[in-house]
């Protein structure tokens, strides 16, 4: 299932291959509950996000498992990232999902903290649409902020997630 990493790469995750097909690349984020890596599906060559959390960490009740379940229950709606796989790998909970682009906060800062009125209206409409969809499925997102809205990548770069 997981192959131990022998060389020292730019990531701190101890496994290089997950679920026999996802190659872990570099660390792209770290939070209080876990670490996010970019990776590649070795079958399709698609770039993915690999979220990890240590199993049994303090103040943690399988947050990734809950996230995987919730995202899977919302699948198919524009702006909900795809979940490819969730599982446990020797001391870690691991969620493999669609890799997204920059957060709204990053884009706002990149634009010198100014969005046009048209951009604000489009983003507000997309945010409301997403939040309504999530609420219609009895899920309450308790951390709504620009850092938690992401844009897509490639041919999906105009989609808000």
Question: Residues of each region from the PLM?
Answer:
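Activation segment signature within eukaryotic-like protein kinase domains
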Residues: 123-124
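Structural motif in protein kinase domains
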Residues: 100-110
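Catalytic-loop of the protein kinase fold
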Residues: 135-153
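Conserved N-lobe ATP-binding subsite of Hanks-type protein kinase domains
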Residues: 35
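Short beta-strand micro-motifs within the conserved protein kinase catalytic domain, predominantly
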Residues: 82-93
């Amino acid at each position: 299932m997981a192959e131990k990493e022998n060389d020292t790469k730019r990531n701190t995750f101890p496994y290089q291959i997950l679920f026999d097909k996802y190659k872990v690349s570099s660390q792209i984020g770290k939070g209080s509950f876990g670490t996010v890596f970019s990776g590649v599906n070795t079958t399709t060559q698609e770039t993915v996000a690999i979220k990890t959390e240590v199993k049994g960490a303090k103040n943690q009740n399988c947050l990734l498992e809950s996230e995987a379940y919730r995202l899977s229950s919302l699948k198919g709606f524009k702006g909900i990232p795809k979940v490819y796989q969730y599982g446990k790998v020797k001391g870690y909970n691991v969620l493999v999902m669609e890799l997204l682009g920059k957060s709204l906060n990053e884009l706002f800062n990149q634009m010198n903290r100014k969005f046009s009125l048209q951009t604000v209206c489009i983003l507000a409409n997309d945010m409301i649409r997403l939040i309504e969809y999530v609420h219609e499925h009895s899920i309450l997102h308790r951390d709504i902020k620009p850092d938690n809205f992401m844009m897509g990548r490639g041919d999906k770069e105009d989609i808000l997630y």
